[in-house]
């Protein structure tokens, strides 16, 4: 008898714990990618998943905020786009805010309501735009003047000084073969002979 009571108590405790599992918004993606860089779509698609273990769980609304400042997004402010509340179950939405600028990081989050109309906010994610058109190209192509069938691999070196402390930098590399990048004599990244782009 005591065993049956203990089993019954354990069963109801498990159901109670399962019912208290918080709703979470996860798997935030831009163009189906996790925190991508170099997006060239002026209208990227943003998606997410709602994790809610309750029976009959459903998303009843969503609101997306996008901004260049992550703190604004944390506070629910989107100067680039605030979709406003949309009564919809959609979890894939096309960006519909101000025109995105090239080479810019945009932070975003989604706020959704569950089946009880309680709101849950996602963690902040981001996407970075790429060149977004040849008119923004400022780089100069470098090469050894040989075609791709020439045997020895070229080695390119460029010395320069920034004149100030570098907070972050990005190198865009397109190679007809493999490459490794070094800065100040130190290899960048943990890959070995990265392919093409």
Spans of features found by a protein language model:
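Low-complexity, Pro/Ser/Thr- and charge-rich linker/hinge segments at domain boundaries
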Residues: 129-151
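Recognizes extended acidic, P/S/T-rich segments that occur
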Residues: 50, 57-105, 111, 115-122, ...
């Amino acid at each position: 008898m005591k065993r049956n009571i203990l089993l019954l108590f354990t069963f109801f405790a498990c159901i109670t714990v399962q019912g208290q599992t918080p709703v979470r918004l996860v798997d935030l993606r831009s163009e189906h990618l996790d925190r991508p860089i170099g997006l060239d779509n002026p209208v990227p698609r943003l998606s997410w998943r709602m994790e809610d273990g309750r029976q009959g769980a459903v998303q009843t609304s969503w609101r997306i905020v996008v901004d260049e400042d992550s703190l604004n997004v944390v506070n629910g402010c989107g100067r680039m786009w605030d979709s406003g509340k949309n009564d919809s179950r959609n979890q894939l939405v096309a960006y519909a805010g101000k025109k995105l600028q090239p080479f810019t990081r945009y932070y975003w989050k989604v706020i959704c309501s569950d089946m009880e109309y309680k709101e849950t906010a996602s963690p902040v994610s981001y996407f970075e735009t790429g060149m977004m058109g040849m008119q923004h190209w400022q780089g100069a192509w470098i090469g050894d003047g040989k075609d791709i069938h020439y045997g020895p691999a070229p080695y390119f070196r460029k010395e320069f000084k920034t004149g100030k402390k570098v907070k972050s930098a990005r190198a865009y590399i397109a190679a007809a073969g493999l490459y490794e990048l070094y800065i100040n004599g130190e290899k960048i990244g943990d890959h070995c002979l990265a392919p093409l782009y």
